[in-house]
Regions:
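Domain-level signal for soluble alpha/beta catalytic cores
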Residues: 1-597
Length: 597
């Protein structure tokens, strides 16, 4: 085939379909391994797609970046075999061959850019000129790998395609518009696109909502949505429907088309006929723009944020939601804390992985019935992306516009057979996702404010600070810290202020210790809390009244030391002792905050 860029200037380019699902429709080995164990079978699949009218095919190497990241032996041989099989099949039809690279995991030990780079360079050494990075949930490592690739192959044609759910977000919570825009702005990519996860009808809506793109756009949806029949995953989307929807996508100006999971040669043949029936055009037409349909903003109480942004010291207080279905006592406690002077009520999301009333639902009740600013904690532990989004939309509609994004305590090992962790993303990605929901044409007219956790007691606080910087870069506005109960925690707070600067609002955590037993438990059994031995020993032999009195003194001492580096305080209520926290709030206001003001 002539140069891909020249071809696209004249007419749309039709790719093949889902190699993996089509090959596995017949008994056989794993798809990539078949390059060595069943080369004729792989070549036959290529030939069927070409006979159906495809002008470009992908090498049978989707899983190689994952294999390279895991340092699996033999992936280089799979790349070479896959490349030769595709080239041999394409030669008979003068079709283009794209080196196909699926997603790579990203870890500190094995960055995604390294895996992408290894596989891309392997294909470059084999003579590849066209590259497809596909089914990606994020763009991590892509630009770095492509820049390195262009050193070896300056005239390479590089496509980058993202796997997007019907709502426009990847499984990592990234909005497709943002991903495509970043790829366009990188200056190293030739075409951008969407593939997999969604069916053609949903993908058509995404394309119509996108507007004009600077680079050629690729669309390769699944044949439909999967069903499980007799323990097999099948796609039942009909070729005629697939072709009709894709024909409308092509008419909107999309220049690169094809199929992903479940698309067979029959789907590609039907699409070939649909494309041949379209009027010829020499330039890509912009995709249509639809009205945003954005809902009007709902009124909310922003007293807390207004004070915080004005430089006033604020008081946030945490009150754990009940373990039972009765919220009346909880609301009474919240009302007392509000009257005492708390600016914000925070509600933990099932702390130490033990079920309590949902923090977001409690926040809505507090906001609605008390008119108090509420900050629900939201963990990554218990919800996937869909459940998280549904909850966020509900919070926004209820006027709760602040959230604390945390990874969350893991489920205890003994319970994991019955209760499963989710952890689809970490707190940084969750924050990025929450921020991405807001804006013109998106789900929320205005952005929610996202806070994060900062562990002042981390053993390696330099690593914790680096993560804090990443959290800010991903959209967080500030931090609530773990309890300050040591001189080292105060020093780490000072370092945090110095490193993060004034752009980060920091609320210093204060949790009154109420007994020696309580102090020992906190030191030994609660992750992220460190109580100095001197403090533990001071509680020896004290009764409840004496313990609370000393706990207040220790908290006030720590608050005085933390105040120069904090924008306020984050108070944690031990054992739901509201009366104790009323006393602490009163002392903080009269002895520190009012005096400072």
């Amino acid at each position: 085939m002539t140069d891909i860029r020249e071809y696209l200037a004249r007419k749309p380019l039709l790719f093949d379909g889902g190699m993996g699902t089509y090959y596995k429709a017949a008994p056989g080995a794993d798809c990539e391994m078949a390059n060595l164990t069943d080369p004729e079978g792989v070549k036959k699949v290529h030939a069927e797609y070409l006979a159906a009218g495809a002008q470009a095919i992908k090498t049978n190497t989707f899983g190689l970046p994952r294999m390279a990241a895991a340092q699996m032996p033999g992936w280089e041989e799979l790349a070479e075999a896959g490349w030769k099989l595709a080239c041999d099949a394409a030669a008979e039809k003068d079709a283009a061959v794209f080196a196909d690279l699926g997603p790579a995991p990203d870890t500190e030990a094995a960055p995604a850019s390294s895996a992408y780079g290894l596989v891309a360079q392997q294909f470059a050494a084999l003579g590849a000129k066209n590259f497809l990075f596909e089914t990606l949930s994020s763009d991590v490592g892509i630009v770095e790998a492509v820049k390195a690739l262009r050193v070896a192959v300056p005239d390479a044609f590089v496509m980058v395609s993202f796997a997007v759910l019907p709502d426009g977000y990847t499984r990592e919570g990234l909005l497709f518009r943002d991903l495509l825009r970043r790829m366009e702005q990188s200056g190293v990519v030739d075409a951008v696109g969407l593939n997999c996860v969604s069916a053609p009808g949903a993908m058509k809506k995404l394309v119509q909502s996108l507007g004009e793109t600077l680079l050629p756009l690729s669309v390769m949806p699944n044949a439909g949505y999967p069903v499980v029949t007799r323990a097999r995953v099948l796609y039942q989307g009909k070729p005629a429907y697939f072709a009709r929807e894709m024909g409308q996508i092509a008419a909107a100006g999309v220049r690169i088309l094809g199929g992903c999971c479940g698309t067979t040669p029959a789907h590609i043949a039907a699409l070939r006929a649909e494309l041949d029936a379209l009027p010829q055009q020499t330039e890509a037409a912009p995709a249509a723009k639809l009205s945003t349909g954005a809902a009007p903003a709902v009124e909310k109480d922003d007293t807390f944020l207004r004070k915080l942004n004005a430089g006033e010291k604020v008081i946030a207080i945490e009150l754990d939601s009940p373990r039972v279905a009765d919220l009346s006592g909880y609301l009474d406690g919240a009302r007392r804390l509000q009257a005492a002077g708390a600016d914000l009520l925070t509600i933990a999301d099932c702390p130490i992985a033990q079920a309590r009333m949902d923090s977001s639902l409690v926040a809505c009740r507090v906001h609605r019935e008390l008119g108090m600013c509420a900050l629900p904690h939201m963990t990554c532990r218990d919800r996937n992306l869909n459940a998280t989004k549904a909850l966020l939309l509900g919070l926004y509609a209820e006027g709760v516009r602040e959230v604390l994004a945390i990874t969350g305590d893991p489920i205890p090992t003994a319970e994991r057979d019955e209760v499963k962790n989710v952890y689809q993303f970490n707190s940084r990605k969750l924050a990025q996702y929450i921020v991405s929901l807001a804006g013109e044409g998106r789900e929320m007219p205005s952005a929610m404010t996202v806070f994060g956790a900062l562990n002042l007691n981390a053993r390696n606080f330099d690593v914790e600070l680096r993560r804090a910087v990443e959290k800010l870069e991903n959209g967080m506005s500030g931090f609530l810290t773990q309890p300050v109960l040591s001189a080292q925690a105060v020093e780490n707070l000072r370092k945090a202020r110095q490193t993060l600067g004034e752009r980060a609002k920091i609320l210093a955590g204060m949790m009154p210790v109420v007994s020696q037993r309580n102090a020992i438990f906190m030191e030994n059994e609660i992750n992220g809390i460190h109580v100095e031995e001197d403090i533990i020993q001071r509680f020896a032999g004290l009764d409840r009244e004496q313990g609370e009195a000393l706990g207040l003194e220790v908290s006030m001492q720590m608050a005085r030391e933390a105040l120069p580096y904090a924008d306020g305080f984050y108070l944690m209520t031990p054992f739901n002792r509201v009366a104790l926290m009323e006393r602490l709030i009163a002392r903080l206001k009269t002895e520190l905050l009012d005096a400072e003001g």
